[in-house]
Curated annotation (Swiss-Prot):
PROSITE patterns on file: SHMT
Keyword Cytoplasm tagged: yes
Any one cellular-component term (Gene Ontology): cytoplasm
Key words, A-Z: Amino-acid biosynthesis, Cytoplasm, One-carbon metabolism, Pyridoxal phosphate, Transferase
Keyword Ribosomal protein: no
CDD domains, per the entry: SHMT
Protein name: Serine hydroxymethyltransferase
Modified residues (N6-(pyridoxal phosphate)lysine): 226
Site (Plays an important role in substrate specificity): 225
Species, as recorded: Pyrococcus horikoshii (strain ATCC 700860 / DSM 12428 / JCM 9974 / NBRC 100139 / OT-3)
GO biological process, one term: tetrahydrofolate interconversion
Taxonomic classification: Archaea, Methanobacteriati, Methanobacteriota, Thermococci, Thermococcales
Amino acid sequence: MTYREYRDKVLHFIEEHEKWRSHTINLIASENITSPSVNRAVASGFMHKYAEGWPKQRYYQGCKYVDEVELIGVELFTKLFKSDYADLRPVSGTNANQAVFFGLGQPGDKVIVLHTSHGGHISHMPFGAAGMRGLEVHTWPFDFESFNIDVDKAEKMIRELEPKIVVFGGSLFPFPHPVKELAPVAKEVGAFVVYDAAHVLGLIAGGEFQDPLREGADIMTASTHKTFPGPQGGVILYKKFADDETIAKLQWAIFPGVVSNHHLHHMAGKVITAAEMLEYGEAYAKQIVKNAKALAEALAEEGFKVIGEDQGYTKSHQVIVDVSDLHPAGGGWAAPLLEEAGIILNKNLLPWDPLEKVNEPSGLRIGVQEMTRVGMMEDEMKEIAHFMKRVLIDKEDPKKVRKDVYYFRLEYQKVYYSFDYGLPMKE
């Protein structure tokens, strides 16, 4: 094979992926789709530029226009999230968490996070960014019935451990965390309160779910490509939570600590997404939550065991389903079958699963944010639930269901809640 043929093959696979994705029902809770305007920014000449440091205080020349875009971004993000500071330089949510752990913690300091099985993100773990900083990781007590942090036990834990940092948020996140209840206790013992909003940033922007910075969080970290429908990247939003020296340590941890150049084409895409969310975010977030609830209810009616019935199933973009009663391999069996039918989601540990079941966990994690952005509403959620029933409960051939999924998805090819297409119109 010639090198040109390698080039052609790569471009072919990209084209095939884009075609395939546009004909599937993507329910991965950590993904989304960007608007044409954002795509233009990400594919721009900003990808060739390097910038280090703050706008107007760069270590490289030639940043005149980059600086203007980043300053607009700081203005829009602080307005959107009512924060005192917005740092667009982290290149991912994990990178943002890494900066916070390195900026505010020292090796041996205690941090309380959500356990992986309970929905905590890997960057919070001893084997992730927290552990890399040398932090002593403790996990929140968890209440299986409410699918949330146990407030009474957590309050006791904070007082006993006197941690340096407490972290709310995670990757399995159907219900708001008790920030309002526990932040005052954390501050009594001198802890910094961090909220990992990676999954729910777009919901927070639209006034749904919860408002961490008003409920007591000092710092909010996030990725920018889940319910916040931007390019892959990160952001740190925070209040004037400490003295200038402490805030300077956080900023120093970002650059030169864990970020050099901050991928300026993605930064520009984040800025346009912030403008889209200021214009359309309220409507988008509201419809995401409506769709998640509608999908959860429809799945329950179809015979699935949906988690959180007593709490209304979900208050976020996520729907959690226990499929262990359908097959011993649970999500490890269900997710590949659904992929054959053109329904893309991921297997997921549930709080009662041991870590050893990571490849055959009980659950499926479902997110509706991308299908909401292409214009789907509550009625479409019922159809999706029925497709899933046909594959997993009725044991219909996934290839047969795939044909129906293909034609169903053909009707939803525009990216709404954007300046390109505006709001979807319900017929």
